[in-house]
Amino acid sequence: MLFRTRVRTRNAHVRNTPKKSVGWYTGSVTTTVLDSIPNGTGPESSPTQKRVLLLKPRGFCAGVVRAIDIVKIALETFGAPIYVRREIVHNRYVVNELAEKGAIFVHEIDDVPDGQRVIYSAHGVSPAVRDRSKGRGLKVIDATCPLVTKVHIEAVKFAKQGYSLVLIGHRDHDEIEGTLGEAPDVTQVVSNVAEVDALKVPDPNRVAYLTQTTLSLDEARDIIHALKEKFPNIAGPHSQDICYATENRQVAVRNVAHNADLVLVVGSTNSSNSNRLVEVSRNLGTIGYLIDNSQAIDPKWLQGVSTVAVTAGASAPEILVEDVVSYLRQNGYSNVEEVEVMPENVRFGLPPEIVQAIGGPGGAEAVPVR
C-alpha cells in the first residue's frame, strides 16, 4: 500500500483523498504532515511494520530531462550515429540506453570524425572545446544545462571586470572543467575550507566566488563563510549557483532522515549530486548508501531496519527507483509512503539547433522560482 505525505511546518492535519494512481503505484493515498509521524510509524502502520519512505522530489531534474531529450530527438531527426562528448548525464543506465539507440559517447572532441554531429553534455564545455569543434567543422548541439551556462556567464563577467575568481567545487568534475576554462588565468578551484587559507590573489578587494551547481549546501556554505572571512569584500553571484534540484533533494533528505533507519540513494558513483545526498544523510546520523540499482543492495544493510528512505539523484531515472522499491517490497517492506517535501515544476526549453531541426516553436529557458 502507498501512502503519500507532504511535509508542512504549520497547521498540521491529515487529509484523506480518494483512491488514485501515484506514479507507478495505485492505492489509498493519505496526505499528512511528516512531523506528526513518530519515528518508525506512519498512517495505519505500527512501530514494527517495515516501511519505505519514498522521497519527493527525487530523480531527474529539468536539465537532465532536457539533455536526454536532446539526444533522443537528435537520433530521431538526424539518425545514428550521433556523437556525445562525455556522458550526457552521470548515470550509466541512461548512457547505456542511449548508446543502444545509436549514440556514440566519446571522451574528447578529437574522437569525433570531422564534420560529424556532436552533442555537448549537460555539464558544459570550455571555450577551448568549442573552438576545436568549430575548427573541425563539427555540427554542434549544445545540451549544457541552462543553470550551468549561468555560472559560465558569471565567470566571464567577473573576469572582464578584473576580479580574481574562486571556483568552489570538485576539480575532477566535468562541470568544473568547463567553467574553469572560461577564465583559466584568473580562476582557482577550492574543494574545502582548508584550501581557502592557501589562496593568494593580486588584490584581496577584487575577488569573486562561484560554485559548482551540484555541491552540498552545507559544504558550500562553510567554504563561502571561510572566503568571506579571508576576503571581506568578496563578490558572489546574483543568485546562488547551486541548482534548485540539488537543493530540493538535499532538503528532502534532511527532512526525512531522522524518521528513517537507512537512506538509499539511487545514482551512479560519478554523480556529484547523488554523492552529496548520501553525505547529507550520514551527517545527520542516519546510515546512507549510494546504489546503482537493487542489485547493489547488501541484504545485511536491512538487518534490524524497519524504515528505509529512498531517493534518487538528479540524473537517476525513475525505473531504477521502481526496481529498488520492488526489491524492498519483496523483502517485507510492504508499506510504501511517498513523502512530498515540496513541489517541483521546472522546465527548460530545447536549444535552437533542435528547435530549428524539428520545426517547432522556440521556447525561453525556464528558471526556478525561489
Residue ranges and their predicted role:
Residues 5-9:
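Low-complexity, intrinsically disordered Ser/Thr/Pro- and acidic-rich segments
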Residues 20-21, 45:
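Intrinsic disorder/low-complexity segments enriched in polar/small residues
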Residues 29-312, 318-370:
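The feature marks the mature, well-folded catalytic cores of soluble enzymes
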Residues 12-17, 26:
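Short hydrophobic alpha-helical segments enriched in small aliphatic residues
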Residues 22-23, 59:
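Secreted/extracellular small peptides and ectodomain modules produced from precursors
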